[in-house]
Swiss-Prot record:
Coiled coil: none annotated. This is SDS degradation transcriptional activation protein. Keywords: Activator, DNA-binding, Transcription, Transcription regulation. InterPro entries: HTH-type_LysR_regulators, LysR_subst-bd, Tscrpt_reg_HTH_LysR, WH-like_DNA-bd_sf, WH_DNA-bd_sf. PROSITE patterns: HTH_LYSR. Pfam families: HTH_1 (PF00126), LysR_substrate (PF03466). GO terms for cellular component: cytosol. Disulfide bonds: none annotated.
């Protein structure tokens, strides 16, 4: 029976592609790592690697073993985390995900409170698109995530808890040329002279933006790092769109400004939700984090967001 140490060594070698780097990653000497891999190959009765002068590559057997090894190691980590958390939250692990917008305000606030209450729990936070987070949840790489749930609500594999909805806005830097046009609300033609930046959006929102694009304003810059988008807007004439909650504090402080749009030009609202696997019991850490996210979501927003 091959033990998990050999599988960890094999996964490290597959990921690094080089014995020296893999040995360093798992704190072994190169000869010891080589012996471990050979023992794994002997135990399975097949060759897992093609050894080249500069790097190693996986055989067909190696690719199959890698897929199963990752699942076994994930299961081992989940088991150890669950056992350590059974009686308290003094240790263990929480693997959490967030979309670009909830990852900019809601989740960090809840996570700060969680870390203060449970400093012994190791947290891995992934900021990604709703699509990628969905896949990672189904692969058991995440236990819980917060993201746009428009395209996830009807998935029977998921448990989705809707969160507060925020109006969508288009924002710019203070002093932007469009802010001087206070005599009328801005139309698509007014916006067309400036690039519009935003994150990857669900189909429903993309359709609405497509209607805007037909009037001359496409989504010219796509970036899933909202902090980068805000910095881009602050330093240029680029416009960006977001739910109001993630820019409300900057608007209130005068670091960003909202554009007043013509009625119906941007009617979309946020659709955040808490997502976990249906029929799965959350770990104590994930359950505690879920409660903090719900509590933070219910708190009074900044004045400019009311």
């Amino acid at each position: 029976m091959n033990d998990l140490r050999q599988l960890r060594h094999f996964v490290a070698l597959a990921e690094h592609g080089h014995f020296a780097r893999a040995a360093e990653a798992v704190n072994l000497s190169q000869p010891a790592l080589s012996r471990s891999i050979q023992a794994l190959e002997n135990g399975l009765g097949c060759r897992l690697l093609d050894r080249g002068p500069r790097q190693v590559s996986l055989t067909a057997h190696g690719r199959l073993v890698l897929e199963h090894a990752r699942r076994l190691l994930d299961g081992d980590r989940a088991l150890r985390s669950a056992v350590s958390q059974l009686d308290n939250l003094g240790s263990g692990e929480l693997r959490l995900g967030a979309g670009p917008y909830p990852g900019a305000r809601l989740v960090p606030r809840a996570l700060g409170r969680f870390a203060g209450a449970h400093p012994g729990v190791r947290v891995q936070l992934a900021i990604d698109t709703w699509y990628s987070l969905h896949q990672r949840l189904l692969d058991d790489a995440l236990e819980l995530f917060v993201a746009d749930v428009r395209e996830l609500r009807d998935d029977p594999q998921l448990e989705v808890t809707p969160l507060r909805s925020w109006p969508g806005v288009i924002f710019c830097r203070p002093g932007h040329p469009l802010l001087g046009r206070r005599r009328h609300r801005l139309t698509a033609a007014d916006l067309a002279a400036y690039p519009l930046a935003g994150t990857q959006v669900p189909a429903e929102v993309a359709q609405a933006l497509g209607q805007l694009a037909e009037s001359g304003q496409p989504l010219g810059i796509e970036c899933d790092n909202f902090m980068a988008l805000k910095a881009l807007v602050a330093e240029s004439d680029v416009l960006s769109m977001a739910p109001l909650d993630v820019v409300a504090e900057e608007i209130e402080a005068g670091r960003l400004a909202l554009l007043e749009l013509a009625p119906g030009l941007l009617s979309q609202r946020s659709a955040y939700g808490l997502v976990s696997r249906a029929g799965r019991t959350l770990s104590p850490a994930a359950e505690a984090m879920r409660g903090l996210i719900l509590d933070e979501d219910a708190r009074t927003p900044p004045a400019s967001a009311r």
